[in-house]
């Protein structure tokens, strides 16, 4: 049997990642009517726009599920979010504003935990609502098969028969009404939203046009800080780390990582911290655009990186950032649990994060406008007396030391001049006149 099934497996158990929305509700009922045995699995990821998780499995049973389970994924999601912070696993940014890979992190947790729950129920066929144009279809494919190598994939949105009968939201709404459930479509927004405890993604529809921006978005994790009528008073906040683990906010210890993120989201959200507008490359190398929220992740990232720069040396910081860019791409591609990703992640957790102990105090204002007010750590290698402009006792180096350093470190100046002369004679570089190197004489090579 092929791994990806193009037709409904009649008479067999089919697990569906069930959100309770129109798409998965119609798909579940349709599969039931066509003779499959649907099993519904709902991930509790702490979605900020979900009011009642317990109601979702009840809906699934009402629509014909053989069994419906709510899987609490919040603790695992929090741990993965902290791991991403520790490793700097973020590769998408614009103008210094970062996207924190919150959807890829959510898919890593959902894809593994839901399939593990299905295995417990002897369900080995899985479907979800991802489309063939997006990233999620590949992420779920990888995480699902990683968790259960015997897994088969059935997606209604890849089944032509389903598409012919229920190809649009209007058709799905009419179908559910005909089935006696009176399902009414919610008011259409100008964009679609997907969220979890770590962040929210707004994309598609009007946001596909770059002429539409953040001003059409209604934030679900924070405030519309760009609106002048929205009052956003400045606020001081401190974040404390112990060996790379965030342990306290404003001096209050929070042992539960879920509660920690909820508190960080509340604080950062009051300012709209962590909102960004990104153009990114999907896995299939086509560009897409999204507007993102991640107030808690942003707050952790700022505090963590401040400690990293105060504690570690330049080469360690450079390697942390290079590895983080690579790890961010692997995470985005659905490879968070692949060996190459584990190697990069655990390297950062062991050799970078374990030294990150201390407290950073910030003032948050509107959006991503903030100031760092204080940095405290027993592991700081920042030592102002080394470079003080004032006279200090037992100075670590003298003027003579610097003379020696300048001489030895810059023996290559004559070599550089020579190379510039070679480039000038080859017509690659202009010396003199109005050129950038106008004052540099071509004396770097021996004249014949």
Swiss-Prot record:
One of its GO terms (molecular function) is protein homodimerization activity. ATP binds at residues 17-25, 43, 129, 131, 136, 194. It holds the Pfam family Arginosuc_synth. Coiled coil: none annotated. SUPFAM superfamilies: Adenine nucleotide alpha hydrolases-like (SSF52402), Argininosuccinate synthetase, C-terminal domain (SSF69864). L-citrulline binds at residues 99, 135, 139, 192, 201, 203, 280. Keywords: Amino-acid biosynthesis, Arginine biosynthesis, ATP-binding, Cytoplasm, Ligase, Nucleotide-binding. GO terms for cellular component: cytoplasm. It is found in: Cytoplasm. Pathway: Amino-acid biosynthesis; L-arginine biosynthesis; L-arginine from L-ornithine and carbamoyl phosphate: step 2/3. L-aspartate binds at residues 131, 135-136. GO terms for biological process: argininosuccinate metabolic process; L-arginine biosynthetic process; urea cycle. Its EC number is 6.3.4.5. It catalyses: L-citrulline + L-aspartate + ATP = 2-(N(omega)-L-arginino)succinate + AMP + diphosphate + H(+). The keyword Cell division does not apply. Homotetramer. Belongs to the argininosuccinate synthase family. Type 2 subfamily. This is Argininosuccinate synthase. It comes from Acidovorax ebreus (strain TPSY) (Diaphorobacter sp. (strain TPSY)).
């Amino acid at each position: 049997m092929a791994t990806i099934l193009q037709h409904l497996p009649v008479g067999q158990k089919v697990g569906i990642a069930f959100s309770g929305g129109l798409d998965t509700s119609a798909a579940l009922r349709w599969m039931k009517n066509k003779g499959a045995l649907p099993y519904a699995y709902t991930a509790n990821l702490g979605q900020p726009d979900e009011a009642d998780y317990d109601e979702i499995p009840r809906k699934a049973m009402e629509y014909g599920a053989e069994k419906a389970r709510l899987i609490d994924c919040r603790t695992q999601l929090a741990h993965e979010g902290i791991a991403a912070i520790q490793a700097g696993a973020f590769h998408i940014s614009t103008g210094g504003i970062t996207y924190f890979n919150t959807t890829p992190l959510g898919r890593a947790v959902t894809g593994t935990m839901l399939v593990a729950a299905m295995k417990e129920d002897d369900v080995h066929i899985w479907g979800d609502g991802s489309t063939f144009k997006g990233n999620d279809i590949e992420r779920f494919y990888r995480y699902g098969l990683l968790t259960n190598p015997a897994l088969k994939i059935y997606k209604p949105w890849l089944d032509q028969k389903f598409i012919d009968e229920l190809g649009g939201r209007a058709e799905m709404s009419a179908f559910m009404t005909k089935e006696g459930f009176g399902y009414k479509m919610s008011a259409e927004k100008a964009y679609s939203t997907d969220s979890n405890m770590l962040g929210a993604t707004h994309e598609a529809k009007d946001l596909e046009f770059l002429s539409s921006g953040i001003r059409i978005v209604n934030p679900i994790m924070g405030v519309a800080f760009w609106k002048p009528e929205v009052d956003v008073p400045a606020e001081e906040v401190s974040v404390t780390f112990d060996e790379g683990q965030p342990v306290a906010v404003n001096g209050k210890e929070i042992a539960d990582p879920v509660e920690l993120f909820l508190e960080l989201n509340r604080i950062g959200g009051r300012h709209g911290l962590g909102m960004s507008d990104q153009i990114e490359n999907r896995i299939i190398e086509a560009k897409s655009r999204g507007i993102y929220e991640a107030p808690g992740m942003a707050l952790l990232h700022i505090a963590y990186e401040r400690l990293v720069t105060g504690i570690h040396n330049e080469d360690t910081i450079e390697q942390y950032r290079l590895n983080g860019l690579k790890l961010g791409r692997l995470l985005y591609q659905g490879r968070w649990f692949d060996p190459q990703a584990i190697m990069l992640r655990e390297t950062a957790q062991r050799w970078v994060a374990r030294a990150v102990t201390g407290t950073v105090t910030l003032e948050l204002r509107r959006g991503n406008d903030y100031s760092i007010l204080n940095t405290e750590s027993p592991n700081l290698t920042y030592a102002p007396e080394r470079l003080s402009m004032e006279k200090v006792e037992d100075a670590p180096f003298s003027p003579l030391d610097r003379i020696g350093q300048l001489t030895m470190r810059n023996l290559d100046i004559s070599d550089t001049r020579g190379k510039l002369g070679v480039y000038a004679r080859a017509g690659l570089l202009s010396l003199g006149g109005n050129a950038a190197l106008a004052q540099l004489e071509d004396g770097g090579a021996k004249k014949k």
